[in-house]
Amino acid sequence: MSLSNKMIFLVVDDSKISRKWLIEMIPKKIVENAEIIEGSNGEEAIALYDQHKPDVVFLDITMPVIDGFEALERIRAINPEALVVMISADRQKSTKEKVLSLGASAIISKPVDEQEFRTTLLKLVF
């Protein structure tokens, strides 16, 4: 992926503040040439993924309607190569193992460290 192509990011979290904060952490040189789509639950994540086919998805685990685990599975059913970064306040090893076994590209713990977030994003898109 190159910065000359318009990238699409899907940011899904039931907290509007968390979504805003995640969006603000995307490096400016990337965000200037990107479309950012927001969702507030797993059901929206699946529909928005199917409609927009984003380059990278940031997906919270604990959300209403459909949780992040199920949303991840359904997104991976649409596109097995989807780049999905799971975001979770749950720091248990079993949670990390579960999301990676479901096909997540990475998992980042809340509170999200800005440097970890940016490093993870840059590894995925370059």
What residue spans do the PLM features occupy?
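Receiver (REC) domain active-site loop signature in two-component systems and cognate sites
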Residues: 63
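Alpha4 helix (beta4-alpha4-beta5 surface) of REC/receiver domains from two-component response regulators
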Residues: 91-106, 119
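Helix N-cap/capping motif at the beta->alpha junctions
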Residues: 38-47, 68
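Active-site beta3 strand of CheY-like receiver
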Residues: 52-58
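Two-component/phosphorelay signaling modules centered on CheY-like receiver
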Residues: 16-37
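C-terminal output helix
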Residues: 112-122
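Short amphipathic alpha-helix used as the core "switch/output" element in two-component signaling
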Residues: 47, 69-80
